[in-house]
């Protein structure tokens, strides 16, 4: 979580936009994101130049020499944040509007990169030089605080806090997934260097970014010292789809600022016939919309064959199974209703997971995980596509704490089940002797089938009732009589004083 001072600076930046006449939250977050990208472009270019120098490799800066726009040219160095942020307001505005912004919208001239696809219609909306100057100063201060912070992922937390200002609740049934929950799911799935990873409802690409960061931490040498695997990581590993062009723009920039140059981020209604993907991905990480609007006529027919429904949370599960290759794995968030819903469609998709594939884990999460934006109760489902069954025992875990208070404040706390969840999931042999009264345990497939494929942990968890010994009736009556006498004596004493 970011510090109070950093939060205050971000809130202050928001106030600067409001005072300058830009009040639409989506416009504000877009403009901030563009400016953060421009700042990070300068930093990443410097970093890559240093890395190339250390390895003795040639490197050509994107800011070298002159930049040409039509018949005009400008020194490329003037497009760097570290240079133009010292310009007077009027000159800074002119350089930003006429040079820097067109430069970033045409950064990849081939128009095939995820970034350039959705920058074509991007517009620089800051109305005055004074507003731009104030915003640049505010961002410089925010970056200073981020650089001073000891937090591991302060930039990600800062960006998450920025995104939280888009609205107080999800649009179209989508809620921002907390970063620590995303990280937990990524660690549970342990992505490999040859994985092909997809989020069919990617939003700002949080799952894809986290998977990329995890691979950098755990598979760095395997990926970055092998030309073929590095090419796969940069160009062929990450796929994200969404129906919101603004989210796609932000998601593409999010990926690029995390060092993934060319993810496949595309506009697509994943549930419709325009999504042709079948048996393509080895790993799906997702938190699909729960109650989004749905045009039933556009839903792909093969998804309706699995479960005939208008509920997006069920259709997305059918979609994940279709998009995964045999042996492919999935970790996804679902609302609790998916686990125990009694409709034909609910039972059909649960039966398909249990009987037709290999359901591995159901991790129930407390309702406060998505606060303050939503109070919905959710669970993480983990399964492998086999096409012919394979479920033996399903692992259940009852998460009661995630490291933050479960109220609207979401303050950090000592109670955190996430490290225990990750450790136990990766050491299943230690779970076989666990009892139903404990926080995690296995349930045999047949027992699940016998219970209409109910996947709610409360169906199988046993609660130990500790007997409470109460005093005998005679003792209670004696105590009451004693109290009565004390009250009477007190009243008599009070009357004597009047």
What are these regions (language model features)?
Residues 1-193, 264-275, 364-368, 390-405, ...:
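Non-catalytic, mostly N-terminal accessory regions of nucleic-acid modification and defense proteins
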Residues 236-239, 268, 299-305, 364-366, ...:
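Short beta-alpha connecting loops at secondary-structure transitions
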Residues 28, 243-250, 265, 309-383:
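Conserved Class I SAM-dependent methyltransferase catalytic core
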Residues 42, 204, 245, 272, ...:
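Conserved nucleotide-binding/hydrolysis micro-motifs of P-loop NTPases
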Residues 358-359, 371-421:
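C-terminal, active-site-flanking charged/polar segments
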Residues 172-286, 291-293, 302, 310, ...:
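Conserved S-adenosyl-L-methionine
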Residues 164-167, 295-302:
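Gly-rich Lys/Arg/Thr-decorated short loops/hinges at beta-loop-alpha junctions or inter-strand turns
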């Amino acid at each position: 979580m970011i510090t109070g001072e950093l939060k205050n600076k971000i809130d202050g930046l928001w106030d600067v936009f409001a005072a300058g006449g830009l009040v639409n939250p989506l416009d504000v977050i877009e403009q901030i994101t563009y400016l953060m990208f421009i700042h990070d472009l300068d930093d990443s270019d410097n970093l890559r130049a240093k890395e190339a120098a250390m390895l003795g490799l040639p490197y050509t800066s994107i800011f070298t020499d002159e930049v040409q726009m039509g018949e005009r040219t400008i020194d490329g160095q003037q497009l760097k944040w570290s240079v133009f942020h010292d310009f007077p307001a009027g000159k800074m505005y002119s350089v930003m509007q006429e040079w820097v912004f067109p430069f970033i919208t045409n950064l990849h001239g081939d128009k095939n990169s995820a970034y350039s696809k959705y920058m074509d219609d991007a517009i620089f909306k800051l109305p005055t030089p004074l507003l731009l100057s104030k915003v640049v100063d505010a961002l410089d201060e925010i970056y200073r605080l981020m650089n001073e912070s000891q937090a591991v992922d302060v930039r990600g937390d800062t960006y998450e806090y920025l995104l939280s200002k888009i609205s107080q609740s999800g649009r179209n049934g989508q809620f921002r997934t907390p970063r620590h929950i995303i990280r937990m799911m990524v660690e549970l799935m342990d992505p490999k260097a040859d994985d092909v990873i997809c989020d069919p409802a990617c939003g700002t690409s949080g799952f894809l970014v986290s998977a990329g960061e995890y691979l950098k931490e755990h598979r760095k040498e395997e990926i970055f010292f092998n030309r073929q695997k590095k090419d796969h990581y940069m160009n062929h590993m990450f796929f994200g789809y969404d129906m919101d062009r603004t989210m796609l723009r932000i998601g593409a920039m999010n990926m690029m600022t995390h060092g993934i140059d060319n993810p496949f981020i595309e506009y697509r209604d994943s549930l419709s016939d325009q999504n042709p993907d079948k048996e393509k991905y080895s790993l799906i990480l997702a938190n699909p919309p729960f109650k989004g609007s749905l045009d039933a006529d556009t839903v792909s027919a093969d998804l309706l064959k699995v479960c005939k429904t208008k509920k997006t949370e069920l259709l997305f599960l059918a979609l994940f199974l279709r998009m995964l290759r045999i042996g492919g794995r999935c970790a996804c968030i679902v609302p609790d209703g998916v686990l125990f819903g009694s409709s034909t469609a609910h039972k059909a998709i649960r039966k398909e997971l249990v009987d037709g594939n290999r359901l591995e884990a159901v991790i129930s999460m407390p309702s406060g995980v998505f606060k303050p934006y939503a109070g919905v109760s959710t669970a993480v489902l983990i399964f492998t596509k086999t096409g012919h069954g394979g479920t033996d025992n399903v692992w259940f875990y009852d998460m009661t704490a995630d490291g933050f208070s479960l109220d609207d404040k979401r303050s950090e706390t000592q109670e955190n089940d996430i490290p225990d969840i990750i450790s136990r999931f990766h050491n299943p042999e230690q779970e076989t002797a666990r009892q139903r009264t404990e926080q995690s345990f296995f349930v045999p497939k047949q027992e699940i089938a016998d219970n209409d494929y109910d996947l709610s942990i409360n169906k199988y968890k046993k609660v130990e009732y500790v007997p409470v010994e109460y005093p005998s009736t005679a003792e209670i009556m004696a105590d009451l009589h004693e109290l009565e006498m004390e009250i009477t004596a007190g009243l008599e004493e009070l009357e004597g004083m009047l």
